[in-house]
Amino acid sequence: MTGGKSGGKASGSKSSAQSRSSKAGLAFPVGRVHRLLRKGNYAQRVGAGAPVYLAAVLEYLAAEILELAGNAARDNKKTRIIPRHLQLAIRNDEELNKLLGHVTIAQGGVLPNIHQNLLPKKTAKPGKGPSQEL
């Protein structure tokens, strides 16, 4: 057996450490997700691809919600996303509302909704009706 601490790599190659998140092109931490999967007692063993996939799904969901919340903030002429914008974004999107239907968002408020029976009756305008001339 030759070598020492080279770990099977050629002794001349110097490679900087690269995180699994950067290898996968993700912003969410793959290492942390892997640790949480192991410590959470979800299964005895966790595959190498599972935390990468889960981190990618979480990043996609976060990006989707933040995009819709940013649109809601812009509609309200605000530059900062607040919980109300998150609530409006989630409840107005059919799939996100189904996914997060039982989730309560603190300081989110409610969706504006007025029942049709409570709205004022629409009446015909006096100038638009049939003429009363003979």
UniProtKB/Swiss-Prot annotation:
InterPro entries: Histone-fold, Histone_H2A, Histone_H2A/H2B/H3, Histone_H2A_C, Histone_H2A_CS. Residues 1-26 are annotated as: Disordered. PROSITE patterns: HISTONE_H2A (PS00046). Disulfide bonds: none annotated. A motif ([ST]-Q motif) lies at residues 131-132. GO terms for cellular component: nucleosome; nucleus. The modification N5-methylglutamine is found at Q107. Residues 1-10 have a biased composition (Gly residues). Residues 11-25 have a biased composition (Low complexity). The modification Phosphoserine is found at S131. The record marks K121 as: Not ubiquitinated. Phosphorylated to form H2AS128ph (gamma-H2A) in response to DNA double-strand breaks (DSBs) generated by exogenous genotoxic agents and by stalled replication forks. Phosphorylation is dependent on the DNA damage checkpoint kinases MEC1/ATR and TEL1/ATM, spreads on either side of a detected DSB site and may mark the surrounding chromatin for recruitment of proteins required for DNA damage signaling and repair. Gamma-H2A is removed from the DNA prior to the strand invasion-primer extension step of the repair process and subsequently dephosphorylated. Acetylated by ESA1 to form H2AK4ac and H2AK7ac. GO terms for molecular function: DNA binding; protein heterodimerization activity; structural constituent of chromatin. The modification N6-acetyllysine is found at K5, K9. In contrast to vertebrates and insects, its C-terminus is not monoubiquitinated. Belongs to the histone H2A family. The [ST]-Q motif constitutes a recognition sequence for kinases from the PI3/PI4-kinase family. Core component of nucleosome which plays a central role in DNA double strand break (DSB) repair. Nucleosomes wrap and compact DNA into chromatin, limiting DNA accessibility to the cellular machineries which require DNA as a template. Histones thereby play a central role in transcription regulation, DNA repair, DNA replication and chromosomal stability. DNA accessibility is regulated via a complex set of post-translational modifications of histones, also called histone code, and nucleosome remodeling. The nucleosome is a histone octamer containing two molecules each of H2A, H2B, H3 and H4 assembled in one H3-H4 heterotetramer and two H2A-H2B heterodimers. The octamer wraps approximately 147 bp of DNA. This is Histone H2A. The gene is HTA1.
